[in-house]
Amino acid sequence: MTLTISDLPRDLKKKIFSRIPLRYVRALRLTCKEWETLIKSRSLKIDEEESQMVALMDYNLCLMSKSFNGGDPSTEIKGKLTCFDEQVKVSMLFHCEGLLLCILKDDNTKVVVWNPYLGQRRFIQVRFSHIPGGWDQFSYALGYYKNNNMMKSFKLLRFFDYFYTSNDFVFYEIYDFDSGLWKTLDVTPYWRIRFFDDIGVSLKGNTYWCAKERKPEWNADPFIIVDHIICFDFTSERFGPLVPLPFRAMKESLVTLSCVREEKLAALFCRDVVVEVWITTTIEFDKVSWSKFLTFGVRDCPMIYSCTGSFFIDEVNKVAVIFGQPLKRDKVFIIGEAGQVRDVDLGEPAHQDSWLYVCPYVPSLVKIKQPPGCKRRRQSSSENRRYKRNMMRLVELEKYHIAMEPKRGDKTI
């Protein structure tokens, strides 16, 4: 009697499937219903010993793995992810439920949402761009709500926020994958999200950022960077209240957020020569509670302050994996509970203005809804009026900034 894979115990089949490269698993799904069920199961997609990450390195996307076998953490670059032509570069990355939102470096007319596992992608045309100095001034977030059929319907949030005393200007808009339309949101921010921390973290369909209370300059504490987090709810399309971080981050300190197994948030706080990692015990739209997870000294690793906004933790072995760019090199710092530090050199990027950003990645069967066909809806007249008003204000703002720039030949004292 010939033994086939179908005759093997279910647990053994799970182990076999978990070691098959993603590019082959898609074909296996079509073989039989049992195999498709196994592939869809969470136990197959999440491996506690070895998990996957997507890294933005040198304007390219790479698949990485992090392993905690035997409590000895390690990272490895598996290879380059290709969604576009080799010449297309990615400047910003956002992850949500296995989907990657890619902001293109040299094309400010569109963004791309990509599912590497299914090989699906969708190009989304943006209504306008704002790139003074050559840098995209927008913040982005990808999230979803559950429709009447309990299916995930995705949306894209896009905004920028100037909070200068005399020239406050905000523009928040959201794109609905179902309708294929943009909508201007009526937002009056009572918060400030740091520009260099604006990638945010996706958790259960919503997005969280580090933030602080919005105050006029004369009434604000100039030394506080952030002391709260804020959530955008994609169901209600609104921001929640500021909820406190377990610390107040002052200047010369580092704060960044991460997601823990798609269930909790973690906050990394570096001050002086001490690093603290906190994990949420409760996390909701309008409330949060924290528990300290790790505290360790980094006297032997002052370069930890070059962290570029990416870190992961292993709750079982109490290890933090932090990504940084000291001395213009991409590096991984692996820090244990006792404060021991090991660093892995990933090399020098070819583009010195690029930055290293890493996000967790779990293969997903979520399909990207494609644009409506011939029955595409049109923007409402009221939305068109709101959009035109904002465009007029933006033009005036850009003129103001051009006028304020030093003239060529002016001496700077």
From Swiss-Prot:
Signal peptide as annotated in the record: none
Segments forming domain F-box: 2-53
Record bears the keyword Repeat: yes
Coiled coil, from the record: none
SMART domains registered for this protein in UniProt: FBOX (SM00256)
Keyword Repeat: yes
Sorted UniProt keywords: Kelch repeat, Repeat
Protein origin, superkingdom: Eukaryota
Ranges: Kelch repeats: 156-202, 331-379
Protein name: Putative F-box/kelch-repeat protein At3g22870
